[in-house]
């Protein structure tokens, strides 16, 4: 008898990242047999809290915390082998089995030390030239994607062939060292401790990069795989898969607040291209959104509040929400919920349902403001514009909703939420036109309200 094909869910961030995707992916993996990362690199940070223990992941899919769940890093991810093994070793010290459950696509482009050097040097050059920084993490993500698009990247599969790897590495170093020294003036830069072992007189050294890559090659070989083939086979055999997005829709290189974006497509459609499955295998798109908005780094943010002034709503969000980046440690900018922004995210992702996270952070605020549109150059609009310049000119149009004083922390029954909290959530549904499937009421895995299970929804 032929097996029933599995049901697959895509989880994407709908704002500027940091929406709490890691917790929800971990929660959903109770119904999944495989979890897939399909874009980004170790610039993304996911925090999981299980039985009070906090775990931060950057590359490895969040499903690794569920025993028996297979984890896949798809071809759309740019891979730092050094950071991957750093993460693996940290998990193994905590008693988590990783290597026998992790598969890495041979088509992943590699992030190498010269990519990080380029990233750091470019941001420094922008700052010295008086240009606003993009706000990258400095981890080489953008330069690695540039090499991929230019068809010159070293990929995971190249690690299997040392001579070929060495030839391509010399070619890349000739190009990138020229840019570092002669265009960006790297001889005048002081690189951080992580890069110093690879750099001499502003240039990245071949031997240091090659020797480390060959050490990683031996460790990585048992995990190398044709991820596309494995995912399609698992689906055909009835496995449920979960595709885990990184960053958020408004950081998407095409649909975000360009140029203040990441270097990959963060939207749901890239789950197919970034892992090697057909779009027909993506059955439910779950959009994760905070009950307010945050953003790290530069770029327009229409509903931003003064989050540094004590006693203000923005300060409340920042402090109660512990709004610091998992990857960078930078403080996140905070602001009111933007439903017009979410409508844009719903449009480009084709959202099936929403998960609202950090509802508990809003406990105690007397009044909440909900952005339902903007005034742009004298005209009222109800959808986030495409261009960063236009977004910067948008003045939010707010609706006022009363806050609540009762705690929502740990609530798992929708009907037990304060009446005004339910009113707030219902208004978000009305304005965006997307049903709420789940609500998170603390970082803990079990503090989740379920209205519609994405794996059961039809």
From Swiss-Prot:
- Please list the residues that bind Mg(2+): 18, 45
Task: State the Pfam families in the record.
Answer: Adenylsucc_synt
Q: Where does substrate bind?
A: 326-332
Spell out the HAMAP family in the cross-references.
Answer: Adenylosucc_synth
Where does the UniProt annotation locate this protein? Answer: Cytoplasm
The primary site where this protein sits is cytoplasm
* SMART domains with a match to the protein in the record: Adenylsucc_synt (SM00788)
Primary role:
Plays an important role in the de novo pathway of purine nucleotide biosynthesis. Catalyzes the first committed step in the biosynthesis of AMP from IMP.
Pathway membership, UniProt: Purine metabolism; AMP biosynthesis via de novo pathway; AMP from IMP: step 1/2
Positions that bind GTP: 17-23, 45-47, 332, 358-360, 440-442
Cofactor(s) the protein needs: Mg(2+)
Q: Respond yes or no to whether keyword Nucleotide-binding is given for this record.
A: yes
Question: Which organism is this protein's natural source?
Answer: Delftia acidovorans (strain DSM 14801 / SPH-1)
Annotated IMP binding lies at 18-21, 43-46, 137, 151, 247, 262, 330
Note on cofactor: Binds 1 Mg(2+) ion per subunit.
Q: Name one GO biological process term.
A: 'de novo' AMP biosynthetic process
Q: What reaction does this enzyme carry out catalytically?
A: IMP + L-aspartate + GTP = N(6)-(1,2-dicarboxyethyl)-AMP + GDP + phosphate + 2 H(+)
Does the entry feature the keyword Ligase, yes or no? yes
Which terms are listed as keywords in the entry?
Cytoplasm, GTP-binding, Ligase, Magnesium, Metal-binding, Nucleotide-binding, Purine biosynthesis
**CDD domains named among the record's database cross-references:** AdSS
Q: Quaternary structure per UniProt?
A: Homodimer.
- What is this protein's record name? Adenylosuccinate synthetase
Which family is this protein grouped under? Belongs to the adenylosuccinate synthetase family.
């Amino acid at each position: 008898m032929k097996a029933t094909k599995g049901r697959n869910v895509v989880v994407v961030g709908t704002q500027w990242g940091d929406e709490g995707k890691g917790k929800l992916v971990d929660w959903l993996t109770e119904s999944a047999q495989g979890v897939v990362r399909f874009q980004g690199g170790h610039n993304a940070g996911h925090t999981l809290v299980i039985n009070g223990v906090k775990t931060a992941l950057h590359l490895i899919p969040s499903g690794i915390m569920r025993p028996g769940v297979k984890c896949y890093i798809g071809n759309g991810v740019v891979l730092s082998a050094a950071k991957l093994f750093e993460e693996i070793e940290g998990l193994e010290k905590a008693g988590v089995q990783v290597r026998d459950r992790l598969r890495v696509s041979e088509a992943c482009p590699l992030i190498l030390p010269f990519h990080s050097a380029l990233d750091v040097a470019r941001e420094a050059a922008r700052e010295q030239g008086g240009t606003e920084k993009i706000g990258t993490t400095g981890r080489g993500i953008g330069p690695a994607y540039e090499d991929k698009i230019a068809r010159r990247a070293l990929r995971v599969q190249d690690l299997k062939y040392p001579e070929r790897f060495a030839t391509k590495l010399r070619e890349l170093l000739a190009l990138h060292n020229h840019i570092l020294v002669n265009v960006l003036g790297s001889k005048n830069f002081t690189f951080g401790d992580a890069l110093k072992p690879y750099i001499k007189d502003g240039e990245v050294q071949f031997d240091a990069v090659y020797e480390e890559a060959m050490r990683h090659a031996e460790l990585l070989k048992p995990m190398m795989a044709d991820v596309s083939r494995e995912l399609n086979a698992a689906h055909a055999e009835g496995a449920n898969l979960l595709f885990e997005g990184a960053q958020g829709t408004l950081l998407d290189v095409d649909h975000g607040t360009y140029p203040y974006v990441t270097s990959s497509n963060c939207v749901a459609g890239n789950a197919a291209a970034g892992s090697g499955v057909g779009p027909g295998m993506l059955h439910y798109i779950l959009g994760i959104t905070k009950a307010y908005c945050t953003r790290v780094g530069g770029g327009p943010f229409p509903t931003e509040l003064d989050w540094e002034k004590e006693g203000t709503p923005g300060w409340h969000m920042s402090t109660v929400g512990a709004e610091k980046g998992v990857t960078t440690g930078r403080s996140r900018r905070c602001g009111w919920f933007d439903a017009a922004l979410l409508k844009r995210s719903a449009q480009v992702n084709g959202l099936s349902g929403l998960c609202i996270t950090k509802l508990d952070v809003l406990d105690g605020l007397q009044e909440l403001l909900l952005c339902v549109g903007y005034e742009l150059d004298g005209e009222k609009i109800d959808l986030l514009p495409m261009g960063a310049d236009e977004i910067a000119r948008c003045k939010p149009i707010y609706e006022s909703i009363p806050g609540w004083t009762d705690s929502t922390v740990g609530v798992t029954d929708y009907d037990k939420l304060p009446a005004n909290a339910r009113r707030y959530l219902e208004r978000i549904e009305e304005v965006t036109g997307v049903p709420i499937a789940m609500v998170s009421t603390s970082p803990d895995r079990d503090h989740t309200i379920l209205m519609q299970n994405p794996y059961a929804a039809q």
